[in-house]
Structures are given as structure tokens and as C-alpha cells.
């Protein structure tokens, strides 16, 4: 193999990167081992750092360097280049370990080993790691956050690459060397990391051209109009947040790939809605929206998810291991994006405003879901009955009606529910909690909806009418059940005795006759009842409450049925 030699400039003059660069032909490069190639990259990087730190022009020789950056120096690379009659072998003792090496290149490679050990030592525990990437991975265990900085080692060195010159050099944390991060050589492959203990210098400049740098030091732009949209990708915590779905990323490349799913026309099209994806796996995940398939169930609460990552984040709710904690209230979250959304609740920030009704939202996807109320769009369709929904969660809840799935079970009585909110409301029957108070009469309710229906008793409002007989009702559900009297429909049948009922609640109450179950117990005397309404009526014996008053004579009663019987006596007297 022919000896690869650098170009030799004059003994005294301006030094360029090409003067100290060592070039190999394609055939020569193929003969080098991996270790030799790594050494070559290390030497070239060191030469680049030296030239840059001295302020020398790093472009091609036929380009004119800026006068401010021209400097006359002795050739530093002569110690690395064998000259006629001078042997390259010389004793080079290592100051770190005392090892003596004869070859200057081996000596440089050996010193780099100590340098790596120093750079790859964990500041928290002192542990040495083999590679910078391993160090970054290890540091996550201490700080509990994701971060990503691409290694300068991955940079590709290109012949005669035109490089810009910085007024003052930046310091790359990976190697601790002065390098031009804005140069074409390093700008695309490395990101500058700024820590509290490091002092960063001014932004790079090119003669006759203004340069704009992103505040996060991860990307440089040639115009101010280019940097402003880029900065909007960041949150105040340095996290990339998708404006379409709210998902957050610590790496720009992951964020960019994710956004491609929202915007780019990929080769994988959804047959249901026509949406395109760049990856087949993304299409498969998306199709679960239409099918309602949830492949990853939570063993703690039974809730299912279409993506494994969503399940892992959800499980942190049960374990309480959320690494992202709100400084205002101390609440922890499994994802940084969820913390950011939560913090907007403290600040009151609502960036998304509906032009139709003026309602505001903190999250864009909530705003999009709300807009479907005005547009009538229902993209989520049930495969069983064809019913469509505006939100995915409503489709999942609806499908449980077909499958009979009731994942939320009461530990007190064993009753199961389709929705967690229904379980929470049901548990108040056992605890006696009634958080909703009527301002008119002081009556308490365990559900907000029951309070709203009750308030119509005071206002006299009955907004729901039967289309057959015109009877008015205070809630829509009562109209639906009433209309079955006209149609004769009794869809709920008892499997024990075959008796049919108008409503599912009536069937559930009836089943307690066969099971003997009496879940509602009086705290005063210990008597148990199969129906909640029976317990309420019984309690009036202890409290003395008589809420039903006769308008004719003013007499009061504990039960409405007793009042009706009493009123009939007035009618008989009138006859």
C-alpha cells in the first residue's frame, strides 16, 4: 500500500485543513482495519480542532479566507509527518500510566483511551463506561430524564468540504475539544450541549452573512424566519411536543418520524378513512382505532390500550413511579408531555379557541374533538352495528355493550360496570358519600346527573315528552323506558324465572330476589334491603322526615304512595 502523505505547504504561511489532511484512495481505505479507520478519524478530528481553535481558514485553498481569520503559524503537523532522515520512532512516555510508546500515532491512540475513560465516567457514581452512548444511557438512571446527543465520532469526513469559520470555538462535551459546531463537517451530525457550568460563546458567523442559532443549540439557520418556526417545536422544558396529538419526544429525529405519520403521504393507506402512513406498524396501530382492538390490557384495572408504550405509561399510575413531578402540587406523571399539559392547568393557559362557540382548550386534540360537535364528524365507527362516534373513547365504551365487557368491579358487592365513573358513583352507595347538594331543599345526591334531574322538580321543567301520549318527563332515559309501555317491549329477561322487565336496572333489582342479596344496610338498626330506594324510605323512620305534603289539608307523609292514597280520600268526599 502506497504511503498516504499530506500535502505540504510552505514552511511559513497560512495553514488550511487540506494542508494537514491525509487522503486515502478507495483501494487503500478498504485495506485498513476498523481500528486504523477509527484512528484516522480521531487524528483528522484533532487536526480540525487545532486549525479551528487557531482561527485558521478551513475552506479549500482556492477560496479566499476572511482577513480577520487569517493567521501565520508554524506547521503543527510536522511532528506527525516523517521527514527525510528523521525517524518517526521516539520514546513517548504516557503521563497518566507511565507506559512508553515509540510510535507517535500509537501514543496518540493510547492517550485517547485515557481521555475516553475520563469523558465516559459517570459524575454521579464514578462508574467508567466503554462508550459515550452507554454513558448517556447510564446517566438516565440518575436524572430520570431522556436526552440525546449524537456522538461526534459518527461524523462523516468529506474531502474538500467547505467549512465556515466561527469567531470563537464551542466546546463539545463528548471530547472536550474546541471544534466548530457550525461547520458543514459537524453541524449535521453533532449537537452542542449547554450545561449550567459551561460558558457558551457567541454564535458562529460567516463573512457577509447573518446566522441564526436555535436557543436549544441543536440546529443553526441561515435566516431568522427559519429559526422561529423551529423554536415553536420546543416546550419550556426542552421537549418536542406534537401539536396534533400532544405526544412528547426528547429526540428531534423521533419527533420528526412521528410527525410524518400526521402529515406525510406514505405507501400504507387505511382502507377505512384513507389516511396514509410511512410505516406499516403505524398503519396497524391506526387500524385498531376502527376495529376497537386493544391488544395490551392492564392487569391492575383491566383497561386496555392499542399501543404497548401507552400501557407502560398507564401502569405508572398504579405504581406511583412517575418520574415527572409538578412543582406546584407534587403530582407525578409517567410522560413529560402529560406533566406539561397538567402545568397549563395551574397557569390557566388555553391556547386553542373555538371560533364557533368561543370555548377554549389547553390541548389541541381536545380542541379537535370539540370541533366535531359543530361539524358533525364521527370518524369512529362500530363494526357490529355501524354506529359512529366523534371520540375513540366513546366507541370503546359502546363496544362493551356488544361484548358484555364490564371491567370495573365493586369490591364490596361484586357488581361490575362498563365505565370507571359509574363504579365511582356506585361506591358512594356503600360509603354513604353524597357530594352533590340541592340549594333549594338541601337534599344530597351521589351523582351530579341525579342532582340536575332533581332540580327540575323545583323548577317544574320537563323537557322530554312522549310522542305517543304527550306525557312529560324530566330526563330522556325516563322517556325511553316509558315508551316501552306503548310498544310492549320488555328487552330484559330473567334467566331464572323468565320474567321480563322494561329496564336493566329493574332486572338487576329483581335478580336479588333469587340470590337473596341485600347490599343496602341501615346504619341505625342494621336492617338490609335489596333496593337503594327501600333503604331511603326506611331511613325516614329514624329521621322523622315526611317530604310529601297534601295541598288540600297540609298533612305530610313519608312516602309518595301514601300521599296518593290520602288524596283519593279528598276526591271521594268531593263526590
UniProtKB/Swiss-Prot annotation:
Annotated localization: Nucleus
A matching Pfam family: KRAB
GO cellular component, one term: nucleus
Stretches the record annotates as Disordered: 69-88
GO molecular function, one term: RNA polymerase II cis-regulatory region sequence-specific DNA binding
Keywords: DNA-binding, Metal-binding, Nucleus, Repeat, Transcription, Transcription regulation, Zinc, Zinc-finger
GO process annotations (BP): regulation of transcription by RNA polymerase II
Keyword Transcription included in the entry's annotation: yes
Signal peptide residue numbers: none
Family affiliation: Belongs to the krueppel C2H2-type zinc-finger protein family.
Protein name: Zinc finger protein 587
Organism: Homo sapiens (Human)
Lineage of origin: Eukaryota, Metazoa, Chordata, Craniata, Vertebrata
